Amino acid sequence: MSNDINEAIEQIEISYEYMLAYAAQGRATDQGDHPSPVREYLDKMHSSCDLLLSSLEYDKKFKNEYFIDAVISDIKVSRSLLALALRMKDISSQIVDNLNASVHLRAMLTDLFVLEDVLKIET
């Protein structure tokens, strides 16, 4: 499996795990006396989505694959959701909980688990 794809998937998984923990904290904001690194994790996830998109859209071995088309679509929607959250002045636990519950984000994660397994088998 391409190192770039592998690293991007790994970063998305790490970020999602942090998002689950942040959502449970009940915070009204990521700012204040004890700022949270949630914004950093969301930004890393967003950047990883960019990397995956460029890898999947331009790699010839993924051309004409309906599954990859769906993966790309799910990544684009998830990336857009992350961008919306990153534009917010305050990122609350509730916002992150809603991101976690998004069918688009969950679909992307499931797609990436499948893609990761398929690419491991091919190498």
State what each model feature region is.
Residues 1-39, 111:
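Short terminal alpha-helical segments
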Residues 12, 45, 75, 105-109:
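Alpha-helical transition-metal enzyme core signature, strongest for iron centers
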Residues 22, 26, 52-55, 59, ...:
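Hydrophobic stripe of amphipathic alpha-helices that form coiled-coil interfaces
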Residues 32-39, 69, 95-103:
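Short, charged, amphipathic alpha-helical segments
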Residues 48-69, 88:
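Short, solvent-exposed, charged loop/turn and helix-capping segments
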Residues 70-80:
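Short, well-ordered alpha-helical segments
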Residues 82-123:
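Amphipathic alpha-helical binding modules
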